[in-house]
Amino acid sequence: MSEVDLVIEVMDARIPFSSENPMVAELRQHRPCIKILNKSDLADPEITKMWLAHFDKEQGVKAQALSVLDKSKTKNLPNLCRKLLPERGTAVKSIRVMIMGIPNVGKSTLINTLAGKTLAKVGDEPAVTKEVSSGQHRIILDGNIALSDTPGILWPKIENENSSYRLAVTGAIKNTAIDFEDIALFAADYLIDAYSEKVIERYKLKQCPQTGIQLLKEIGRRRGCLRAGGIIDMQRASEILIHEIRSGALGALSFETPEMIANETASINAD
């Protein structure tokens, strides 16, 4: 980190707190930081505004919402780097930028857009860039900006249990390491509380179910997830819900707000 002037941390706009690696703040120390709320097209725009305001209050931090649907903002990142470090970015002094982020937050897509060509493989499963991007550690961008990539790594212990669920729901944890029924139940309960109208519209319901179990059963019935004897296949129904959340089929969803996280953190600290 001694040769880094600025850090870009890429997070998932649907779960900014849960996808923010706490080790980044320790590593960057006094260096300015651009926090990217990526995949903002999949996140609730009103809640994204709350998060941008929240992060902009931090010392030395500028937050920016980005989406693959609008590459112009991504391509403007070098200009933002120069604004944060006006004394660098000249022919004499380049701005040395390190880009960091947990798996599957869209870091590879961001790098490819900035570079104007494919340097890192893009995929829906975490850690697909590990082997492909080796040897592509340093990228020279427009305006004498040197961008260094780092592997996407989850920190060893996640203290907030709800964050673990949110990371699984949005795809930051490999499918082979999760219980679909467990995380789908978590997601279903949240959607009933926060986005009941979208649930009703997507699954053509007369009214929103009272519980997550009931919602998963409704999805199973309406999507033909039935076993012998008409028993609902809860595994298949769970996979459908998680897939439709990740793909944006349910609309723009956010799974945490600054106020929600403040309350959860206070509860954890009290214990």
Named regions from a protein language model:
Residues 1-6, 13-33, 40, 46, ...:
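Helix-rich effector regions associated with P-loop NTPase G domains
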Residues 27, 39, 111, 115:
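Short, conserved active-site entrance elements at the starts or edges of catalytic domains
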Residues 34, 40-102, 119, 224-226, ...:
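Canonical P-loop GTPase G-domain recognition
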Residues 73, 106, 146:
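Short phosphate-engaging motifs
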Residues 76, 80, 109, 113, ...:
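Alpha-helical scaffold segments in soluble metabolic enzymes
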Residues 81-88, 114-122, 126, 154, ...:
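Short, well-ordered alpha-helical segments in soluble proteins
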Residues 92, 113-114, 139:
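Solvent-exposed alpha-helices and their adjacent loops that cap or buttress functional pockets
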Residues 97-122, 150:
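Glycine-rich phosphate-binding P-loop
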